[in-house]
Curated annotation (Swiss-Prot):
Interacts with GyrB. Inhibits all the catalytic activities of DNA gyrase by preventing its interaction with DNA. Acts by binding directly to the C-terminal domain of GyrB, which probably disrupts DNA binding by the gyrase. Its cofactor is Zn(2+). This is DNA gyrase inhibitor YacG. Binds 1 zinc ion. It comes from Caulobacter vibrioides (strain NA1000 / CB15N). SUPFAM superfamilies: Glucocorticoid receptor-like (DNA-binding domain). Belongs to the DNA gyrase inhibitor YacG family. HAMAP family: DNA_gyrase_inhibitor_YacG. Pfam families: YacG.
Length: 57
């Protein structure tokens, strides 16, 4: 069983794994950059912002 490209379903090329080509890798990157793909976060992500006292000792 060979792996298939998640963009076009062609066999994967090890040079571009997990994609079959640079084109499919670029299509995937553009989808991330345009906001088409997102990683869901919990509601508490905005309620607990990072501390502003990072450099404080």
């Amino acid at each position: 069983m060979s792996a298939k490209c998640p963009i076009c379903a062609k066999p994967v090329d090890s040079a571009f794994r997990p994609f079959c080509s640079k084109r499919c890798a670029d299509v995937d990157l553009q989808r991330w950059l345009s906001g088409r793909y997102v990683v869901a976060g919990g509601d508490d992500d905005e309620e607990n912002p990072p501390s502003q006292d990072i450099n404080r000792e």
